[in-house]
């Protein structure tokens, strides 16, 4: 059983109230609307006095000529131009000269930005002389860049119309194309013997006729040193130096560190002796005949140890590139993984990507509970609320507001299917 609704104490503003609204659209009834509100209220139309800036102005009594016309006409004439705004003085209507203004004292006055103060509408003489030259006054050599009276043909302005430029600017020919009239010549019907033309034997051009044999490139095989390749004119140096790519067969010699080279580098550029005697020593290309007389020996003299056969080659040692490298350490993140190429970056910054079953993520073991993300932290938990009870809502409202709602809407107090719900006739 629901208890009786509290009616409350009658307050002064309830006595002054004109009652609740009968309009069901006015759902929210406030104390101000019930006490002072009137239906069809229309505000009075007033006059616009001014903005808030006007209150800071000093009271100024303007003196106009119409007010002083009867009492003091002389005072009105004196105060006629005193109260005039700066905008009305500066921005006046356009005044066109009627010819009654006096002529200026000097025709070369400096013109201002206003059109009414210009003495004449024509361009000044100084601007005219910059464009039109007077040769009688200055002479052809007085001004640099003075154009002659007749412009050369190449300097004349020519039209870009292709129809005008055809046939040497005589217009296009009849039944001919633009390309044919410009770039193709008409074939002559006369035979060649009438033109007195003769075709001789084919000769070499200027690139090969005046060329001489180069002593740097040409080297007869008889003058070549033993071990040096013979450079013939017909043999290309590019083809001999840049050979095609060949695949290894397995019988090549292993690379070893040359004796006499520096240990801190991996290059054998400073090699003075070649361990393999079967490989011919490299010799530079002779630049000239006179230069060959002062060249050193191409082959190094063998020492006594080499002649006795006591020169041995030691075991292979690491070069300068691998001396400073750390030892090969298998990565602790995945010891079973075969890391053939281990770099410093892979050793320090290993991959943090899960492998195997760990790579499945949330799908492993079924659907996992959703974790709160950054977007869902500030969102409240949404749930299905129960149907609002009108009686419970009326108990928490003001008594006057509750009576206003029940008088305006008789279906608000009880549910529609209740026996107590009786519509007012």
Swiss-Prot record:
Residues 207-222 have a biased composition (Polar residues). Residues 93-126, 203-225, 316-335 are annotated as: Disordered. Disulfide bonds: none annotated. GO terms for molecular function: phosphatase binding. It is found in: Cell projection, Cilium; Cytoplasm; Cytoplasm, Cytoskeleton, Flagellum axoneme. One of its GO terms (cellular component) is sperm flagellum. It holds the Pfam family PPP1R32. Keywords: Cell projection, Cilium, Cytoplasm, Cytoskeleton, Flagellum. It comes from the Eukaryota. GO terms for biological process: flagellated sperm motility. Microtubule inner protein component of sperm flagellar doublet microtubules. Interacts with PPP1CA. This is Stabilizer of axonemal microtubules 4. It comes from Homo sapiens. The gene is SAXO4.
